[in-house]
Curated annotation (Swiss-Prot):
Keywords: Amino-acid biosynthesis, Cytoplasm, Diaminopimelate biosynthesis, Lyase, Lysine biosynthesis, Schiff base. The record marks T46, Y109 as: Part of a proton relay during catalysis. It comes from the Bacteria. Pfam families: DHDPS. Belongs to the DapA family. InterPro entries: Aldolase_TIM (IPR013785), DapA (IPR005263), DapA-like (IPR002220), Schiff_base-form_aldolases_AS (IPR020625). It catalyses: L-aspartate 4-semialdehyde + pyruvate = (2S,4S)-4-hydroxy-2,3,4,5-tetrahydrodipicolinate + H2O + H(+). This is 4-hydroxy-tetrahydrodipicolinate synthase. Pyruvate binds at T47, I206. Homotetramer; dimer of dimers.
Length: 293
């Protein structure tokens, strides 16, 4: 899918200081990413703090992004969880007309076997009216979707079109790139190794830092896709300290501090997450201040 090549950003859900959803700030976040040149937007991913949003708030965020985007960029909707039947029901009842694809995380907490993971995504693929992006993030799910399972799904279902690979394991990403069907996309879910994955044949990234530095990060990925490694790595090295910092005390606390430093949103997150401490906030603020040209 050409629309999923390049940089997608996993949008935050901005909160006011009273922890209510800040719609005006969300509008600014969406426009900042679009104006910065990213290729697509991901709604209701992990970075959106969807686990601590009510059903009504989720719909508010989704509809706001659709309205602000106005069809300018492709949209991907996060539809995942550890209750397969519930996900299948959502896929059968929700209107997906505004979305290019869904992003579906491997089941967390239950710790399924590889066969369980396969059967979970088989049910999703058979129910989904739009293409499916698998999402492997073992640091959050406690179970790693192995390359053999990914490749099996890619071969068995035409609408399983990509994986967001966030195991942080280059060897694993390379095996999927090597063995998956020709048109299957390997999308990095790790900002720090996104460029190496792209240079190795990956299709791009679903990024966190990319919404704070959309122009720089998306251009870096485009350079990588065009095999202009030396030029691309200049941006990689420029942003590497900030990438480390935004994950130091958890996501999305770090990227929300970047947004606060940019004057786009508050840095508020909902419990059980907490905002970054004063020391890290100061370091992030200094980076942002010194990076503004």
């Amino acid at each position: 899918m050409q629309s999923l090549i390049g940089t997608g950003v996993a949008l935050v859900t901005p909160f006011k200081k009273d922890f209510s959803v800040d719609i005006e700030a969300l509008q600014r976040v969406v426009n900042f990413s679009i104006d910065g040149g990213v290729e697509y937007l991901v709604v209701m991913g992990t970075t959106a703090e969807n686990a601590t949003l009510t059903a009504e708030e989720k719909e508010l965020v989704i509809n706001t992004v659709i309205d602000v985007n106005k069809g300018r960029l492709p949209l991907v909707l996060g539809v995942g969880g550890n209750n397969t039947m519930q996900i299948v029901e959502e896929l059968k009842t929700r209107d997906f007309s505004a979305f290019e694809a869904i992003l579906s995380v491997s089941p967390y907490y239950n710790k399924p076997t590889q066969e369980g993971i396969y059967q979970h995504f088989k049910a999703i693929a058979e129910a989904s009216p739009v293409p499916v992006i698998l999402y492997n993030v073992p640091g959050r799910t406690a179970s790693n979707m192995l390359p053999s399972t990914v490749i099996r799904l890619a071969n068995d279902f035409d609408n399983v079109v990509a994986i967001k690979e966030a195991a942080g394991d280059m060897a694993q990403a390379l095996k999927i790139i090597k063995d998956a069907p020709k048109d299957f996309l390997v999308i990095s879910g790790d900002d720090m190794i996104a460029l190496p994955i792209v240079l190795a044949g990956g299709a791009g990234v679903i990024s966190v830092i990319g919404q704070g530095y959309p122009k720089e990060f998306s251009e870096m990925i485009r350079l990588g896709l065009n095999k202009k490694a030396v030029e691309a790595f200049k941006t990689q090295y420029f942003l590497s300290d900030c990438i480390d910092m935004i994950f130091e005390q958890g996501n999305p606390a770090g990227i929300k501090q970047v947004f606060q430093a940019l004057g786009i949103t508050e840095n508020t997150v909902r419990l059980p997450l907490v905002s970054v401490d004063e020391s890290l906030a100061e370091r992030i603020n200094d980076f942002v201040k010194n990076s503004i040209k």
